[in-house]
């Protein structure tokens, strides 16, 4: 095997196990330099070493030599390269981006890191960066904390941003038999805050994560500062003809039902039409990584079932409860969203006259499809809170 380039040797030489969340005793990361070669890095026994490429790696990182040199100098260049498509991270964002964070050479408080938190109910995988008022980011159905990489990069200069894999998804536990409804997820969120010793946080939620953020705020208003809800999944107001059938259908059927990758790719393209191809490919990888496990499929179907079955009206109905929401809220809607039509904004405005609204030309994942506009709005909104720090220029505005 030819010697690894100096920039790869620099990265490996800086490896810091304390910020690398290895879920296995032996982790293999493949580093590909376009038109120049491939090298594997194996993390085992607390150290990282360059070895001959072999077998199936846990993550594959691909970039040209100039991009790798930039990453070796400054991790933020790696995040910029990933967002722009110059760096590809495939198979496992948790491992791939976690490796970059562990080889950045950064030592200051608030640097990007990945870790697993043992809560009272489950082990939850988180990605966090920054110092300041805490912001908890909750991903959507079938997603992972990786969908908030742009958010972490954009807001970490002013906030401590924590993105979590919800139970049932990503690298978090996937308990068989859990209800995976809004109440269950809200309880998991509070368990995480308790484990992190956080009394109060701002919440940012996308899709299912938006619904969970609302549930946390409705049940525990004293634990929530402000709410930023990105295309949140809300209870359907109109007739739902499939309700009787879905009530009879058990989510455990997901234990045996698979989905081919081409089908998943087509769905992801429709859901996030404004995303770069690299993001779409990574999103498909992240979805399939959990979905291809029986417990992950069961969690997905259970959560999807509860979104559709949630009672919209009546004393305990969602829209009745929504009127009692206390924290200030910002709703971000996508004009091309096929899952949560923008017509929901009118119903939210009726229930919450003081809530703010932003419409963007995107689909269902604004933080990925329209990162500059989304994060500018989030930074401005969250900075109005009494405990927010002064406003430096964000990286995305430079």
Question: Where is each model-derived feature located?
Answer:
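Flexible "cap/lid" loop of the alpha/beta hydrolase fold
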Residues: 218, 225-258
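Conserved HGGG/HGGXW glycine-rich cap/lid loop of the alpha/beta-hydrolase fold
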Residues: 122-171
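Active-site loop/oxyanion-hole signature of alpha/beta-hydrolase fold enzymes
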Residues: 163-204, 208, 376
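Short beta-strand/loop motif that positions the catalytic acidic residue
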Residues: 325, 331-333
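Conserved alpha/beta-hydrolase catalytic His-Asp/Glu region
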Residues: 259-323
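Catalytic active-site module of serine/aspartate enzymes centered on a nucleophile-bearing elbow/loop
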Residues: 354-398
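Alpha/beta-hydrolase fold catalytic core
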Residues: 94, 98-135, 158-159, 198-199, ...
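Feature captures hydrophobic
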Residues: 1-115, 146
